[in-house]
Amino acid sequence: MELWFSEFHTPDVKHSLRVDRHLYSKKSDYQQIDIYDTPEFGKVLTLDGNVMLTERDEFIYDEMITHVPMAVHPNVQDVLVIGAGDGGVIRELVQYSDLQHIDMVEVDPLVVEVCKKYLPKTACRLEDPRLTIHYEDGLKFIRSRQEEYDLIIVDSTDPFGPGEGLFTREFYGNCYKALKEDGILINQHESPFYPGDAAACQRAHKNIVESFPISKVYQAHIPTYPSGHWLFGFASKKYHPLKDLDETRWNMRGIPCRYYTTTLHKGAFYIPAYVEELLKHVEKEY
């Protein structure tokens, strides 16, 4: 008998993956955690029945949420990552030799433990000496920080359950205070395609625009995420994601990527008309 994993993207749409083995299943204090082994996408991590990553396409998300700000900010030394218990963002960040310290705040220790065991290619750099892992609520952690970070990356789950508070105006305001005077905030912005996801995307962007002087949106195409069309938010106190992009400086680093390039960086900020329409009432002009 064939085993399939299915995730509903809307009440009328579901995405299914054939499963070879169900490797892990446990409910933590925060959420249901499962690992599946699939023939097409390799190992798959789901939280509360929602795909968080697959071995085959996680590089797209992790490269785009990490390297876009790193190619813009001229001197990132201190980074805060909220979420990211799978380790993919950390794997990308530690390739920057001049980065001095990373605080990673993950509410669920079991996510980190499971990913270290079952997703070693993603969680392979969680022992880097520059990394400090804090197992606590990101909402509470950020409230006590003042002008400490050059970059904050919010690699949260979807805007419900444990990750719900990471999309609020209060949270983005606290991120602003935690950033240095030229700091950048990056967050995953959900998909703009299905109406329910689009509404969450619009709310999150509105809250960011009200907190930061520079707020833009960029995109990537991730096969296993709802609709495959995914947005990220770029919010900054000083730097513009295109005007301040330093292609030469970033390319000289020689960081190997499978998705991100500085050419793609520029194109990613040119969003489709339907997304412009969704965000036009809250987007600022620069």
Q: Can you annotate each of these PLM segments?
A:
Residues 2-4, 53-182, 194-201, 279:
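The AdoMet/dcAdoMet-binding core of the Class I SAM-like
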Residues 172-173, 198-219, 233:
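Conserved Class I S-adenosyl-L-methionine
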Residues 1-34, 227-286:
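SAM/dcSAM-binding transferase cores
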Residues 182-189:
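Conserved beta-strand signature within the Rossmann-like core of class I S-adenosyl-L-methionine
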Residues 187, 213-218, 242-245:
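Acidic/polar loop patches that form or flank catalytic/metal-binding clefts of enzymes
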